[in-house]
Swiss-Prot record:
Keyword vocabulary terms for this entry: ATP-binding, Cell cycle, Cell division, Cell shape, Cell wall biogenesis/degradation, Cytoplasm, Ligase, Nucleotide-binding, Peptidoglycan synthesis
Single GO term (MF): ATP binding
Binding site for ATP: G109, T110, D111, G112, K113, S114, T115
Pathway: Cell wall biogenesis; peptidoglycan biosynthesis
HAMAP family with a match to the protein in the record: MurD
Compartment list: Cytoplasm
Physiological role: Cell wall formation. Catalyzes the addition of glutamate to the nucleotide precursor UDP-N-acetylmuramoyl-L-alanine (UMA).
Organism: Thermotoga petrophila (strain ATCC BAA-488 / DSM 13995 / JCM 10881 / RKU-1)
The name this protein goes by in its record: UDP-N-acetylmuramoylalanine--D-glutamate ligase
GO cellular component, one term: cytoplasm
InterPro entries assigned to the protein according to its UniProt record, in alphabetical order: Mur-like_cat_sf, Mur_ligase_C, Mur_ligase_C_dom_sf, Mur_ligase_cen, MurD
Catalyzed reaction equations: UDP-N-acetyl-alpha-D-muramoyl-L-alanine + D-glutamate + ATP = UDP-N-acetyl-alpha-D-muramoyl-L-alanyl-D-glutamate + ADP + phosphate + H(+)
C-alpha cells in the first residue's frame, strides 16, 4: 500500500508518525513549501519519500492521500486528484475511524469553539474523567490513539470537516454559524454544509446540541439524533443566570456575551450527558478563559483596555461590541470577504471611533461613512490614536475582524503585541 500526504502541517506530521509505528506501507510526502532540515532528516531516517516546493503527479500513485486541512479545494493538485478518482481523507477521519464514537465530543462553530472545547475538557477532567483535548485545538486527534481516554474532546474546523469524508460523531455541539472563511470556501453554503456534515450522519441515540438561531437548522427533517437547541425558553442565559431545562441557576461570575454563550452551550451538553448541572457550575468557577478572547488587560489613565485578538470575523467583533455602550475599536488583519456594509450598519451605534490598519482597512473604508475613523500603519500607531481619541472611562477594544497573517504569525502574537504596548504605556494590569 502507498499512502500520500498532501501538505505536511501539524496534523499530517502526527498521522505519519503514528502510521510509521502501526502500519506497513510506503509513504510519500508532498509539500508546497520548503521543508526544514530537521523534517528532512526525520523523513530520510524513516525511508519516507518526499518532494518539496510544489506537488507533482507522484501523488496519483498513492492508494489514499491525506489532505492537510488548510489546502484549498480549488488548488490544481486537488482538482487533478479528484478528476482521477483518488481517495482523499484526513487525519481527523483516520482518528474517528479508529476510536469508540461514544467517547468523542465534537465541537464546532464560527466563534467561541476553542473556549467551549477547553471548558468541556476542563469540567470532564475535574470531574475525574481522563479527557483528551485536541483536534483543531492544538494537538492533532490521532495522537490520542497512543493512549486510553474516557473522552476525546475535539474542536473541529470547517476545513477539517470539509475534507473528512464521513465525520460521524455521537456527541456534537454547534455553537453558532456566521459568514467566515469565504476566502477559502467557494460559498457561504459550502462553509455551512462543512460545519454541519456530522449532523446528517448521526443516528438514533446520538446527541446534537445546537444554537436555535442557525438558519440552516430551522428544518431538521432527516436528522435522527436527539436534538437539543439552546437560546430557547428552556435553555438560555442572562448576565447573571443560566437557565437549563427551564431551571434557573446563578452564574458564578460575570461573563461577556460570547463566554455566556459558551457556558450555556456546554452546560446544555453536560446536562444531556450527565443529567445534572450542580457539579458543572462548581467546576466552572475554576475555569480560566483562554487568552486573547475578550481579555481585560487593565487601565491607562482611566481608559479600559480589552484584547480580543482571536476575533477574526465580523460576527465575533459584533459579539464583543455587544458587551459595551460605546467603544474605540481597533480592527486589522486580512478580511474574509464578508458583508462589510451590513457589519458597519450593525456596529455603528457602538462605535465612538474606528481605527483600522492592515489589509482589512481597504475593505472596510468604503462603508464607514460618517463614523469617526482613522487609518493607521500598525499596532503602535493604532494604540497612540486610540489614546488620542478616547477619554477617561472609555473602552479601547482590539477586536480585529480579520486573520493575522498580513503582519503577524498568528492571532496570539498579535494579541501579545497589543499587550506589550499596553505595558509599555504604563498599563495598570489586573
Amino acid at each position: 500500500m502507498r499512502i500520500g500526504f498532501l501538505g505536511f502541517g501539524k496534523s499530517n506530521r502526527s498521522l505519519l508518525k503514528y502510521l510509521l509505528k502501526h502500519q506497513e506501507a510506503k509513504f510519500f510526502v508532498s509539500e508546497a513549501k520548503t521543508l526544514d532540515g530537521e523534517t528532512k532528516k526525520f523523513l530520510e531516517e524513516h525511508s519516507v519519500e518526499y518532494e518539496e516546493g510544489g506537488h507533482t503527479e507522484k501523488l496519483l500513485e498513492c492508494d489514499v492521500v491525506y489532505v492537510s486541512p488548510g489546502i484549498k479545494p480549488d488548488t490544481s493538485m486537488i482538482e487533478l486528484l479528484s478528476s482521477r478518482g483518488a481517495k482523499l481523507s484526513t487525519e481527523l477521519q483516520f482518528f474517528l475511524d479508529n476510536v469508540d464514537p461514544k467517547k468523542v465530543v465534537g465541537i464546532t462553530g464560527t466563534d467561541g469553539k476553542s473556549t467551549a472545547t477547553a471548558l468541556m475538557h476542563h469540567v470532564l477532567s475535574e470531574r475525574g474523567f481522563k479527557s483528551f483535548l485536541g483536534g483543531n485545538f492544538g494537538t492533532p486527534a490521532v495522537e490520542a490513539l497512543e493512549g486510553e481516554y474516557d473522552y476525546y474532546v475535539l474542536e473541529m474546523s470547517s476545513f477539517q470537516l470539509f475534507w473528512s469524508e464521513r465525520p460521524y460523531l455521537s456527541n456534537f455541539l454547534v455553537l453558532n454559524i456566521s459568514e467566515d472563511h469565504l476566502d477559502w470556501h467557494s460559498s457561504f453554503e459550502e462553509y455551512v454544509d462543512s460545519k454541519l456534515k456530522p449532523v446528517f450522519l448521526q443516528t438514533e441515540g446520538d446527541l446534537f446540541v445546537y444554537n436555535k438561531h442557525i438558519e440552516r437548522l430551522k428544518d431538521l427533517e432527516g436528522v435522527r439524533s436527539r436534538k437539543i437547541p439552546f437560546w430557547t425558553d428552556e435553555n438560555f442565559a442572562t448576565e447573571k443566570e443560566l437557565i437549563v431545562r427551564g431551571k434557573r441557576y446563578t452564574l458564578p461570575g460575570n461573563y461577556p456575551y460570547q463566554m455566556r454563550e459558551n457556558v450555556l452551550a456546554v452546560s446544555v451538553l453536560y446536562m444531556e450527558m450527565f443529567n445534572e448541572l450542580e457539579s458543572f457550575l462548581e467546576l466552572l468557577r475554576d475555569f480560566k478563559p483562554l487568552p486573547h478572547r475578550m481579555e481585560y488587560l487593565g487601565q491607562i489613565d482611566g481608559r479600559h483596555f480589552y484584547n480580543d485578538s482571536k476575533a477574526t470575523s465580523t460576527h465575533a467583533v459584533l459579539g464583543a461590541l455587544s458587551n459595551f455602550d460605546k467603544v474605540v475599536l481597533i480592527m486589522c488583519g486580512i478580511g474574509k470577504k464578508e458583508n462589510y456594509s451590513l457589519f458597519v450598519e450593525k456596529a455603528s451605534p457602538k462605535l465612538k471611533h474606528l481605527i483600522m490598519f492592515g489589509e482589512i482597512s481597504k475593505e472596510l473604508a468604503p462603508f464607514v461613512g460618517k463614523i469617526p475613523h482613522s487609518i493607521v500603519e500598525n499596532m503602535e500607531e493604532a494604540f497612540e490614536k486610540a489614546m488620542e481619541v478616547s477619554e477617561k472611562g472609555d473602552v479601547i477594544l482590539l477586536s480585529p475582524g480579520g486573520a493575522s497573517f498580513d503582519m503577524y504569525e498568528n492571532y496570539a502574537k498579535r494579541g501579545e503585541h497589543f499587550r506589550e504596548i499596553f505595558k509599555r504605556h504604563g498599563g495598570d494590569e489586573v
